[in-house]
From Swiss-Prot:
GO terms for biological process: proteolysis. The active site is at residues 295, 369. This is Probable cytosol aminopeptidase. It comes from Teredinibacter turnerae (strain ATCC 39867 / T7901). Its main location: cytoplasm. Presumably involved in the processing and regular turnover of intracellular proteins. Catalyzes the removal of unsubstituted N-terminal amino acids from various peptides. It holds the Pfam family Peptidase_M17_N.
């Protein structure tokens, strides 16, 4: 999808659609101009109550040929109501309105559209408040591009008669202010790149486990590298993983007939030969049965999403490539299946991790931390500035935080603060959880250095405590995305989170 900026007006702009906005019970500037040209039909929609003052409510307005309006159609979208004596509008209302516009246009025959959201920055307009801070036109443009790109995503891979792709291919951000027009250009590029990264993450997550295997992820890494000279990739197979002494990782992989893979992608958009990279580590369990500690059958199909951490690393890399980001990032994926078999690990088995620490496997369904702990040891060789692991790690995090916030743990507060700020800026928030020594005792084992579970109390915290024992040599953060990586129910599918958070962090790290 192509994004442009242009100084234009809704009357003379020829496009498939003009998107204009209402706020409170009034039309914004461009909508008012169109209302005059179209005989008051927009204001009538407001007065009649057909378009309610709720964020995201929208209405198609017919454009008669004799009106002089060059757009083929008009979409009127409501931004909701202002607050504090009409001086502020919540950023969430703006997001809802843009989301609604993107969804409507992706389902329409319009091939291009012009969006007049810049009316929110006219003199006397209310301030857009984003978690206590004012949001500028660049932030709005970034969110707009991201939302339009993600609205265009369709999962078609395994349908015999796939749904056709949306017609929309070009979106123009209209503004009559030259300074703002220049400012939003890079924001549109960033938002579109993040949207493309999120769509890759969604696609990988949505694929079934019989297609998206560890070997398939290796091929995806090769495809990214083939398209970008700044990205190199390599992978280690299961024998090489075992030879490195990654006993925890191998204990998970050995139950499957499919070879595990450790995938390394290095994007070098900045820095010399000795520059320290930021490292992303993704949990890539392409299907999780629970192993010998078998999961219940209900909803087990959703365990194809257990590689959401790996998918988000791919998505972040894709976004960095798309925007030609000036950063040095290494993404490492621990890819395996967790399957029951005669070779699979059993509850009570004890393995030696790459770090030399021994682990009693009390539950084979706590496998994510086993593949991650060895990968976190492996990445020490890169002498990283920071390491962020991303994993659909615990159901306990879903109980604690639901499906809105990603759980964040860190051994360095400065790193945690950067990630929290990145999440707020990207509208992809995380919430910091405790990583206190008090919880470490729950991992005690009578037979090994530690157990791989710490009991039901504070399960997300003890999982993070387990990982923290393998991250002593660098600043580290853990993102538990079990509640945010996918949706269940009628809208079942990968969300593309936390790609926005990760990219925002890496660009400002």
């Amino acid at each position: 999808m192509k994004f442009l900026t242009q100084k234009t007006d809704a009357l003379s702009r020829a496009s498939g659609c003009s998107v204009v906005f209402a706020l409170d019970n009034a039309l914004l500037t461009t909508a008012l101009a169109l209302d005059d040209a179209l005989g008051g039909v927009l204001s009538q929609v407001i007065k009649s109550g057909d378009l309610k003052a709720k964020p995201g409510q929208s209405c198609w307005i017919p454009v008669p040929a004799a009106s002089g309006v060059k757009a083929a159609r008009v979409l009127l979208v409501h931004l909701g109501e202002t607050s504090e004596k009409k001086s502020k509008i919540a950023s969430g209302s703006v997001i809802s309105a843009l989301q609604s516009a993107a969804a409507a246009l992706s389902a329409s025959p319009a091939k291009d559209t012009t969006v007049f959201i810049d009316d929110l920055f006219a003199d006397g307009a209310p301030t857009i408040e984003h978690f206590g801070e004012p949001a500028d036109a660049s932030w709005v443009a970034e969110q707009m591009a991201k939302l339009f790109v993600t609205a265009s995503y369709r999962y078609t891979e395994t349908f015999s008669k796939p749904e056709p792709a949306p017609a929309l291919g070009k979106v123009t951000y209209a503004s009559d202010d030259a300074t703002r027009t220049r400012a939003v250009k890079s924001a549109l590029l960033k938002g579109a790149a993040i949207g493309e990264g999120m769509n890759l993450t969604r696609q990988l997550g949505n694929l079934p486990g019989n297609i998206c295997t560890p070997a398939y992820l290796v091929e995806q890494a090769k495809q990214l590298a083939a398209a970008c000279p700044k990205l190199t990739t390599k992978s280690l197979n299961e024998k090489q993983i075992e030879k490195l002494g990654m006993g925890a990782f191998h204990s998970v992989a050995k139950g499957s007939d499919l070879d595990a893979q450790l995938i390394i992608m290095e994007y070098k958009g900045a820095g010399g030969a000795k520059s320290q990279p930021h490292v992303l580590v993704g949990k890539g369990i392409t299907f999780d049965t629970g192993g010998i500690s078998l999961k219940p059958g209900a909803n087990m199909d959703e365990m194809k999403f257990d590689m959401g951490g790996a998918a988000s690393v791919f998505g972040a890399m894709k976004a960095l490539i798309e925007m030609d980001a000036k950063v040095h990032v290494i993404g490492v994926i621990a890819a395996a299946e967790n399957m029951p078999s005669g070779r699979a690990s059993k509850p009570g088995d004890i393995v030696t991790s790459m770090s030399g620490q021994t682990i009693e496997i009390l539950n084979t369904d706590a496998e994510g931390r086993l593949v991650l702990c060895d990968t976190l040891t492996y990445v020490e060789r890169f002498k990283p500035k920071s390491v962020v692991d991303i994993a659909t790690l615990t159901g306990a995090c879903v109980i604690a935080l639901g499906n809105h916030a990603t759980g964040l743990y860190s051994n360095e507060q400065a790193l945690a603060d950067k990630l929290l700020a990145a999440g707020v800026g990207a509208n992809d928030r995380a919430w910091q959880m405790p990583l206190w020594d008090d919880y470490q005792k729950q991992l005690d084992s009578n037979f090994a250095d530690m157990a791989n579970i710490g009991g039901p109390a504070g399960g997300s915290v003890t999982a993070a405590c387990f990982l923290s024992r393998f991250t002593k040599s660098y600043p580290w953060a853990h993102l538990d995305i079990a509640g945010t990586a996918w949706q269940s129910g009628a809208k079942k599918g990968s969300t593309g989170r936390p790609v926005s958070l990760l990219v925002n962090y890496l660009l400002n790290a």
